[in-house]
Amino acid sequence: HDDVRAFTPPPDNVTELAMSPLAKTTLETLLYRGSTAAQLETVLDQIDVDTCDADGENAFFVADLAMVYRQYMRWVRELPQIIPFYAVKCNPEPLVLHLLAALGLGFDCASNGEIQSIIDMGVSPSRIIYANPCKASSFVRRAASQNISLTTFDNIDELYKIKRFHPKCKLVVRILTDDSKSVCQLGIKFGAPLADVPRLLAKARELELDVVGVSFHVGSGCFDPEAYRDALCRSRKAFDMGREHGYTFDFLDIGGGFEHDNFEAIAKVVRSALLDYFPDHEFAPGGSLVPSGLRIIAEPGRFFVYHAFSLATNIIARRVSEPSQDDEDSTRPKAMYYQNDGTYGAFNCILFDHQNVQPKVLSMQRQYVYQAHQHAPGVQQDLWPCSVWGPTCDSMDCILPLTHLPRTLDVGDWLVYENMGAYTLCAV
C-alpha cells in the first residue's frame, strides 16, 4: 500500500471543540470532503490497469475520519469520566493519530516505535502510557530519555529493570482477568494473578519504586460486558492490596476490548461497577486528576477505527475450473480469484485478529458498480461459488475458501472490503 489514498473528514462541528490553531490547520489541510463511495470512485478513475506502471494498481484504503470522530463523541457521551488512550498498535495511520491528538486523547504505546511516532507529533509525554509489561532494557532507557513517566509491569524482573534504568517512573501493576469472553485472549501472555500481586508490591516497596495504580485488559473484542465487572472487582482487591503495602493508588486503567456493536452495554456495566467497587473515590471528569480523585483511563483501539476504513483490492488473476457434473454443487468453488493483498499484508487480521471478511464488488467489466450492483436485478442469480486468494506463493495466503461473486467478475476488476480499520494497516 503506497498510502491511504483518500479520506473523508469529521463533521463541520468538529472545529467547535477546543482545538489549537495547529490542530485545526491539520484537519483543514489533510482531509477531503465526500463519501467513502465517492472517494473510491475517484481513485479508480485515476487507475488504468492496462497502462499503469508496476504497482500502479496497488490495493488501497479509504478512511472515513468522520466515523472516528463519531466514535469519539459516543465515548464522551457514555464514559465521560474515563479518558481514552488510543491503542496505537491497532492502526498507526498518521492522520488518525493527528485527529485523536487534536481531540485530546492520550496514547497507549507498546513499543519504542509507537512512542516515537507520538512524540514526533508534538504530543506531551504525559499523554502516553507505555502499556507493555515486558520491555527490552534499551526501550526502558529510551522511555526514560523521552520523559515517558508511566508504564505497566506484571513481574519482578521488570521491577529490577525499571529500578536500574528508569527509577523515577510511575508504575501500574497489570493484573490477570477473565478474558474467555473475548475474540483475542491476552491473559495467556500478560497479567499477574491476584495471588501474585502482594509479592510484586512488596518487591516494588523494597526497591523504592512508585506504584500508582492498577491496569487490566479483558481481551480484544470483548463480547460479554460482564467481563468488565469481574475485572473491576479484581481491581478493587488489588487497590486494597496496595493500601496494605503502603501505597495510595489513584490510577486505574481499564484496558481495551470495546466493540462497536455493544459499546453502550459495556459502558453501562462499567459505570455501574465503578460505583459498586470504587464508591469512596471522587471520579475526575475527563480523566484529569483532582485531590482525592481517581484518574481512570482506557485503551480502546478497534472501537475508533474498525468501521472507518475500507480496503480496495485488484483482481490480478483468475482460474476457472473445467465444467463437470458437480457444477450444481454450490459448496465447491468454480473459480479461484487472486487479488493483490493477502494474509501477509492487511489480511493478516484473518490469522491474528480472527476477523471474518466479505468482499463487495467495486468495479466489474471496468465499470464502477459499488453499491449499485448489490441490488441490481439478476445479480444474485448470476453468482457462482469461488475462493479468494492473496498474491503470494504460500497456500496459507487464503482470504476466503468459499464465497459467492458474480460470474462476470474478471481480471482487472476491483473488490472492496469494508470494516478494515483494525489490525490491518499495522502490517503493511
Give names to the regions the model predicted.
Residues D2-P21, T177-S324, L405:
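Active-site loop/helix belt of alpha/beta enzymes
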Residues L97, I119-D120, V140-S145, I162-F165, ...:
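Short acidic, glycine/serine/threonine-rich loops at helix termini
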Residues G106, I129, L150-T152, V172-R174, ...:
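Structured core elements
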Residues Q71-M73, P94-H98, F223-P225, E299, ...:
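Short, solvent-exposed polar/charged micro-motifs at secondary-structure junctions
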Residues H1-K170, A204-E206, D210, E244, ...:
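A charged N-terminal "starter" segment
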Residues I47-D50, V269, L275, P279-V428:
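Charged (often Lys/Glu-rich) extended helix/loop segments that serve as interaction or gating elements
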Residues V88-E93, A110-E114, P133-K135, D154-E158, ...:
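Active-site beta-loop-alpha junctions enriched in small/polar residues
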Residues V62-Y69, P94, C109-N112, S137, ...:
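Electropositive phosphate-/nucleotide-binding environments in soluble metabolic enzymes
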